[in-house]
């Protein structure tokens, strides 16, 4: 039955009893009434009942089972006897953290649905190791958002009786009361009009907004919806949270309070872990809970106590402590992190990370995040008064350690964009000694200090960039800063005769302050036995000649091209002109270095390949190219499957005249390693300080196998360049006559290959073969397997080889080819230090249900050493996860300026325990090296629930 409630909600009991009188005949044959009544809502909001003028023929009585309510003495006595003779309902405390099986063997009383009975949509939302899920049954009003004071009330039962003098309504048999989204179910109910309350007994269920309370007996306040359920169990469906309590109270605002209660995300038949507290409060409105005098129990055994805990019950944000983590390490000793989250507003928040380290003290770190309609970003800071003294004798070490960070992206409008990436650290050893929890802060050799303003027009882009770097290493030379850099690039909006006109403009100031003096290591040395000098020269003192210059650079690069496109191919002639003007400053040390290098070359009879200093330098170089390709395709079959196979030959001719550039310093230029894409670049250098002279014809061909649905099964590209002159323009210090690849008539053969067996696994390879030396110049082969429908399986295998690096040598201050560190015969020299010849294998694979093997092995064949190896296992179920991994790795910790001396092997055994619903208890570092070391690990975790 359904009646619209009067506007005043406190008349709810009268509404119930009146509805019973008005709409339901008396239930039992032994109830005798002298009069029948017609009842309706009065003008005052109460009920007006009047005797019927005539006793009409009543409809037949419904037949009810033995559970129907009765007032006969005999029936009541029989019922009492049956109850006394039957088994009493078990207490929830007897279940020891599991669901109460006496209520239902399959835990259906908790809305538990086994995995085999879940629908496809429900399975997609259920973790792979969960044997089922809590599914709230569909019921009328479950999504009703109407205020309860305005919502109609529904009452149903198999039998009912009303005692008018006592103003008590008694319901029996499948009792259901519903108002708005709240629904109460029981075997029997007594509603007391005078006291505005009800008593329910037998299989009591209280449902509201995705929460379920189950108990043996309940008291409910009819005018507010407050309820107390004895011997209670509860479920929060979406959060997969359940528990029990001596009794549970539901407040009018739907907050649930538990006396001597438990909290867990484990399945009903599991007591793997639970929180047990004297008083537990769950607030579905905020998504968080609190508990006092709490013990964390594993298999009902207490393992941890806390007087207070604040924990999430869903994924919403709320201020409070986050799960703590603790670990041990040689640099920190015992470490405990107790993060606290501040939910300040919907669009900004903050997190404080107090990090106690037994060897170093208390590191206070925090971050503030913000989000507006036009911007997003974060501020971060960290501070430590370091108690550790291992580095106190090292140069640049600071006892007061700190880090500041600001990251920002925003737009003043749709065209004007701003970006900031600024990090400052107290000393170059900060990231080697200390961890950071700030999002986006990367531990590299340099920290970025950059601010950018970009304006995007219809046909152009203007950009102002101010960028500096701070060293986070003592084994590198101080880099150049751009203070500032202004670029203006675009294309003309008109295209006469199909011509495209483009332009690139840059004005930038390069500046750096090179460090002077000596560097002392962790022992305060070394001490020269002859001179008594302490320490070694800083690496910055190795920078000599033009490499010490600062200056301004103006670069202009207009271009014109004529793209011609047809269905069968394309042809694009292009002409560019690159003009660069320099205004340089060189200190006395740099000028003296140029003179000394010239004198040394003269004395030894060698060729001087360095440059001469002139304050004003300029260079103008035309760049002409002709790029063309054809497109052929055909329908074919491969292993019985239809494909469209393409054949795409390409020819690229490039002519750039030789221009002497040795008097120009290198500010931001390098030479990328050779690959297939190198064949079709118009400058073999990156940056603007060098324009490579070229007279070459590059030939390449690509073939693809494409399925009818557009899926590219396979792609292969192969090509080679034919050179018609030597490449004389080189980076400073390199003589083209000593480079075999600069005087060769042909480039290496370049090959790229990709094969996808399906969307689950793929293989990629690249290979560069030098026909002059009949040897591989570089190459790699990678295999990756991870099924879309089961990302828990991950296999990676790869091999890399490279020995054609062009790099800046920190020890000599010059550009060099090859992989050697330092100079032969000099201290610290290591042959083939930078040469790459490695294999990398990693796997995550299920062994048996819920058990996975995890392993990685990265080996360096060049130096016959293992770079990293770890192996272990993972146990994962619906409510907790454990990983135990043994790991060996090469650790880099700077106690010297010579990079090879800072490498040493380290070992560790890592344990990670994750209680789902509470977070990681220990072992957060495990996440870090698994994420970095195993491709596909992050995708696996994101999809594994």
From Swiss-Prot:
Keyword annotations for this protein, in alphabetical order, are: Cell outer membrane, Membrane, Signal
An example GO biological process term is: Gram-negative-bacterium-type cell outer membrane assembly
Q: Where is this region: Disordered?
A: 56-98
Q: Where in the cell is it found?
A: Cell outer membrane
Question: What cellular-component terms does GO give this entry?
Answer: cell outer membrane; transporter complex
Q: Where is the signal peptide?
A: 1-33
Q: Which Gene3D superfamilies does the entry mention? A: Lipopolysaccharide (LPS) transport protein A like domain
Looking up InterPro entries in the UniProt record yields: LipoPS_assembly_LptD, LptD, LptD_C, OstA-like_N
Q: Where is the composition biased (Low complexity)?
A: 65-79
Assembly state and interactors?
Component of the lipopolysaccharide transport and assembly complex. Interacts with LptE and LptA.
* Function recorded in the entry: Together with LptE, is involved in the assembly of lipopolysaccharide (LPS) at the surface of the outer membrane.
What name does this protein carry?
A: LPS-assembly protein LptD
Q: Which species is this UniProt entry from? A: Pseudomonas fluorescens (strain ATCC BAA-477 / NRRL B-23932 / Pf-5)
From which lineage does this chain's organism come? Answer: Bacteria, Pseudomonadati, Pseudomonadota, Gammaproteobacteria, Pseudomonadales
Query: What gene is this protein translated from?
Result: lptD
